[in-house]
Curated annotation (Swiss-Prot):
Keyword Thylakoid: no
Protein name: S-adenosylmethionine synthase
Binding residue positions for K(+): E50
Keyword match Iron: no
Region (Flexible loop): 107-117
Matching Gene3D superfamilies: 3.30.300.10
Originating species: Roseiflexus sp. (strain RS-1)
Pfam families membership: S-AdoMet_synt_C, S-AdoMet_synt_M, S-AdoMet_synt_N
């Protein structure tokens, strides 16, 4: 999002979310459920787990290094699918009867040696766990973090509302309030901005899989009144707000029967809804030595603390890494003209208050715990309903004092 966004008197921005029963999200959740199982067995496990699904089938592939022991992957897959809500063959997909194929093997030793001992300290002899420099980045790449003061969770409003709608759909389905809903669904919200501030919701789109015998009129009424109006603040809705509910007119065939799914295909849904840049790396199925995940979490942590400290109203950070190297290659910041102190000062304060080496990120955010399955639906950021330590603003006060604010 450029600085022109802050200068425009009228601008529209749209973000989407998907429900936990979307085929791509099934795969993300399976990959993270498998990851959590390995981390429960061995907190230092190295995991790269990918999942694909189509009609009647889930395939789990990847590379894993861990202390030997039995991990019941097929059982984990079926339980995850059942928890999502695919419990009846009439939905087009059933946890008990779908096929499950597993093809997982060991991590490449060439990659492992770079992660195990970072380039700066690699050599003969044992390196202790306490030396954070011993963990090098698991791959090259750049990661972004973002925060803004549009919402209490310091997230962009369009993606925040889209996620709230998705969670509400899931809750009403699972509680039996709207029993005709099925697990697959999508939401999309368009917000009107004026000079960088949200002023109203222009359009809300909801598509949700449903039973064949329910009418479109009932679906539209229930979704507008029990879902949209329940989560969108009334002051943001006016007589010009537009609603689209299942605009194709019918959404009976859904889930993996309607579309194939794959881990890592909803990276914008997972992050900031397109409001911020993205380095391209997906999160789910990756242990925290993979900086695609851990560094993106750290960048969100930094950005949220900068905004919570009042150093800027909108803030984006980029961090870049080389495989096997612990220290970031570069760190850059962008405040979109909203900063209260210079960007140079903010960058200096970040370097003083945050250690962005992979080992330090894992240590400070306690990332070797099995906390990832809940992140795999409804966004990794802006969450107060799950264990997400990168959402803490524990360094905001120190940043504020150091900046003289």
């Amino acid at each position: 999002m450029s600085t022109s966004f802050m200068k425009s008197p009228r601008l529209f921005f749209t973000s989407e979310s998907v429900t936990e029963g979307h085929p791509d999200k099934i795969c993300d959740q399976v990959s993270d459920a498998v990851l959590d199982a390995f981390l429960t067995h061995d907190p230092r496990a190295r995991v790269a787990c990918e999942t694909a699904t189509t009609t009647g089938l889930i395939v789990v592939i990847g590379e894993v290094t861990y202390e030997q022991g039995y991990i019941p992957i097929e059982e984990i897959v079926r339980k995850t699918v059942k928890d999502i809500g695919y419990t009846d063959a009439s939905y087009g997909f059933d946890a008990d009867t779908c096929g499950v194929m597993v093809a997982i093997h060991g991590q490449s030793p060439d990659i492992a040696q770079g992660v195990d001992r970072a380039l700066e300290v690699r050599g003969d002899g044992y390196v202790t766990d306490e030396e954070v420099a011993t963990i090098g980045a698991g791959d090259q790449g750049m990661m972004f973090g973002f925060a803004c003061n549009e919402t209490p969770e310091l997230m962009p409003l369009p993606i925040a509302l889209a996620h709230r709608i998705g969670r509400r759909l899931s809750r009403l389905r699972k509680e039996g309030v709207l029993p005709y809903l099925r697990p697959d669904g999508k939401s999309q919200v368009t917000v009107e901005y004026s000079y960088g501030r949200p002023v109203r919701v222009d359009t809300v789109l909801v598509s949700n899989q449903h039973a064949p015998d329910v009418t479109q009129d009932q679906i539209r009424h229930d979704i507008i009144h029990q879902v949209i109006h329940a989560v969108v603040p009334p002051e943001l809705i006016d007589e010009k707000t537009k609603y689209f509910v299942n605009p194709t007119g019918r959404f009976v065939i859904g889930g993996p029967m309607g579309d194939s799914g794959l881990t890592g295909r909803k990276i914008i849904v997972d992050t900031y809804g397109g409001m911020a840049r993205h380095g391209g790396g997906a999160f789910s199925g990756k242990d925290p030595t993979k900086v695609d995940r851990s560094a993106a979490y750290a960048c969100r942590w930094v950005a949220k603390n900068v905004v919570a400290a009042g150093l800027a109203d909108r803030f984006e950070i980029q961090v870049a890494y080389a495989i096997g190297v612990a220290h970031p290659l570069s760190i850059s910041v962008e405040c979109f003209g909203t900063n209260k102190v210079s960007e140079e000062t903010i960058l200096r304060l970040i370097n003083e208050h945050f250690d962005l080496r992979p080992g330090a990120i894992i240590r400070d955010l306690r990332l070797r715990r099995p906390i990832y399955r809940p992140t795999a639906a409804y966004g990794h950021f802006g969450r107060d309903d799950i264990d997400a330590p990168w959402e803490q603003t524990d360094r905001a006060e120190a940043l504020r004092r150091a900046a003289g604010l």
